[in-house]
């Protein structure tokens, strides 16, 4: 979606290009001028299987298969899978407190849409693809659905989606909100548009105190003149009920490890280059003994790419399980991470060894399996901080220290057991955040 990112933020172009500072008027003009090109771009994405060809009109605010449910409709925007989990956790708590509410969840990705279909079948939830931020497309969307309130999850902030919602005088909330330091700097280069966008919500639920400060600065608030509440509630991605798993799959992996007398090393939520790095590191270790290295990529469609790098291995998506003398196994499915966490002797949490920003550490910490991560953890900085201090997570900064840390972590000690117990308690407490956030949200909506 590089073209859309440039429209959203022209300062994301390569260094050396003339910097372009957006005003609201110029932003709208860019969308209107580039609208036909963006339409063409979306149809190209259909060929790449990155868009649903049967629902492509939803990206233009039209062609919805579902009708607006009667009664109160709360709109939650969750761009992709991670935000989608936070949205579902929030919906579950809001539904407990307000049984007559209905929920519309918009997403940007097919994977997130499939996750909603799988997990919300018996909930008052409707899914739609996010309209792109062309002023007319957003207007069509709001006119069709007529939401009674809007909640934007995490860090996907689109100017027209936010400001047009604000113009309709709807309660507008940013929840589980965070923004990277580099993104903050880019927004600061466009102060007119940033201030109007970030001062629009009446409530911001930030993930930590640093994020609270970022949002207050972008909104142009100083101490004593804030027109909105910015409250720290933490990330909303995890809940205790997510500790359920595919028991048969989990037990099959444990039985394999028992029969093979090997340790299970799980490379979880990995991104490009990380599988190769972890495989090479583990293969050089002489003190680990027999092991099974399971790859559970963040995006399972990368399975062919991983096999081309590391060679043939059994695949979960084909109904296969590890066989004697297998060193690698590819768990290329969605919705089975908890079973993998439970079966593993150690978790190497991906998205943290290059520049992806890391993934939610709360979910694996719930299972009590020790975790290793890399240096790139800015997306969940506060949660990593407390879990690193507890000792259930260990952080490495090179392949050399990764290998050493794997060996040390597999040698369970009483100190590590205490760290795991402490980390599990922290993770369980974090899973209660959606309850706290729901109270703030209901109070704002019903004000």
PLM feature spans:
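Nucleotide-activated sugar donor-binding and catalytic core shared by glycosyltransferases
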Residues: 2-7, 13-447
